[in-house]
Amino acid sequence: MTGRRAFLRAAFAGGAYAVGVAHGSAQTQGGRRMPRIIVCDVNETLLDVGALEPHFKEAFGDGRVLQEWFATVLLYSEVATLAGPYSEFASIAGAALDMTASARGVTLSAADQNRILQGMLTLPAHPDVRDGLQTMRDAGLRLVTLTNSAPAAVQQQLANAGLATFFERSFSVDAVRRFKPAAEAYRSVAESLGVPVDQLRLVAAHAWDVVGALRAGCAAAFVARPGKVLYPLGPKPDITGPDFRRVATLIVAAEAQQPPR
């Protein structure tokens, strides 16, 4: 259980961010629309959750169980938002791991749990991420993160992946106790940064995250990693690319050419 305790300690630690809803229109400067602030999702968008597959192979005999587990984590984060009560992401991850093991008739050892849950804090960045972040930073774009993970957990994740220095701030849904894609999660970032919500552009590899951001009033860009597709019944982002590097290039071009509103 050491891994679970470490994950939970990281999740419970850290400060809260300001909560609220930002209204108003996009900011302009010198008659032109100011570039949006880029809000990056973390798990699967920046960090490679697939790095946990060997641990699932060892624990379950099939590395593909990783996807079943992570889908369960996301499902029950939505249950916590829609039906309550709120539980932080690490607790849901641990509960989903227990559910997955029970459903498959597997008894997980403490070592198995440790490797999987501790592994969430040490995920590597996708190979295309660093170049993409550098491209946007070189263009003068402001970069922040928004994640379902708790504040201290994401700080560890970004530091361990070598990405922390790219971001001016990291935001967590813990501030509003409602998981993405709830509108409050995105709007709390705008409130904390002191900008209208349409001054934000989410970058994510999850269709549900893109839909949530667009419905909240943000712009969005979709990273169509292998196996990731947009939701056909939802609003569509103006930027889609096959990898983070390409999406970053498209974002720079789009934000440089935005006319005033």
What are these regions (language model features)?
Residues 24-28:
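Boundary at the C-terminal end of the N-terminal hydrophobic targeting segment
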Residues 112-124, 129-159, 171-173:
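Substrate-recognition element of Asp-dependent hydrolases with the DxDx(T/V) motif
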Residues 77-115:
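A metal-dependent, Asp-based hydrolase signature
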Residues 1-15:
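N-terminal secretory signal peptides and thylakoid transit peptides that target proteins
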Residues 32-33, 139-141, 193-196:
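Glycine-rich phosphate-binding loop signature in dinucleotide/nucleotide-binding domains
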Residues 31-74:
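Active-site neighborhood of HAD-like aspartate-dependent phosphohydrolases
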Residues 10, 134, 150-151, 155-261:
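Asp-based, Mg2+/Mn2+-dependent phosphohydrolase catalytic module
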Residues 53, 66, 70, 90, ...:
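An amphipathic alpha-helix signature
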